[in-house]
Regions:
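Hydrophobic alpha-helical packing residues
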Residues: 44, 112, 144, 184-191
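Hydrophobic, well-ordered secondary-structure elements that form the walls
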Residues: 83, 124, 144, 152, ...
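Generic alpha-helical structural signal
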Residues: 38, 106, 110, 138, ...
Length: 212
């Protein structure tokens, strides 16, 4: 399992050092050959004894055409992608400063579906972010159903001292957050059941982690 706080940042430090060296020497900047997380997957693909590779968590901005071109032939890579979402509403995403839109997120999912046979998606969602209206919450509810997640981790927003969100206006009442959380949890369970039902009768290579 490839894991880290920000998987998409792998290789950024290599590129930073290459730029510094180019500036210091006056040479033309050349970033070819500098590895990223896609190169790590390909390297592990060629290691005897490693039969299954999984990426623990993926930032949507990590799913680039270059990354997909590298990993699409990696048959040891488990086609499960935990794509960080937080909200399916663009106005909430903007307040969160997430750096992507719901349309861009869906585009990443569609590109992964084009590269892999029956990939599964899981995600995290926060309900009750400051200022979240009922209409904005409904957008998130509709969006998660469009993506059709296999599973979701759902959290109620809780302010942390010193963060911008903690001092935002229109903090959401605890009861409202509880209700919205329950609605998303129910929707997530329904999606899980439908995803599992689609697998009935199919043969798949699986990894058994514990005795059933």
């Amino acid at each position: 399992v490839l894991t880290g706080i920000n998987m998409s940042s792998y290789g950024v430090d290599f590129k930073r050092e290459a730029r510094k060296e180019a500036i210091a020497t006056g040479d033309k900047e050349d970033l070819t050959g500098i590895p990223d997380i896609g190169d790590v997957v390909i390297a592990l693909q060629g290691v005897d004894g490693i039969e299954r590779i999984r990426i623990s968590s993926v930032d949507p901005q990590m799913i680039t055409d270059e990354f997909l071109e590298k990993i699409k032939g990696a048959d040891k890579l488990c086609p499960h992608f935990h794509l960080s979402m937080q909200s399916g509403c663009d106005t909430v995403l903007k307040r969160m400063n997430r750096g992507y839109s719901s349309e861009e997120y869906m585009d990443k999912c569609n590109k992964l579906r084009a590269c892999f046979d029956n990939p599964s998606f899981t995600t995290d969602a926060i309900v009750g972010f400051p200022g979240e209206t009922q209409e904005e919450f409904d957008e998130t509810l509709n969006f998660i159903r469009q993506v059709d997640f296999l599973d979701m981790h759902i959290f109620q927003f809780s302010p942390r001292n010193g963060t911008p969100a903690a001092s935002m206006e229109k903090q959401i009442e605890p009861r409202v957050k509880q209700v919205r959380s329950a609605i998303l949890i129910r929707a997530a369970k329904e999606m899980t059941e439908k995803n599992l039902e689609r697998m009935v009768g199919k043969k798949e290579k699986v990894l058994v982690e514990e005795k059933v």
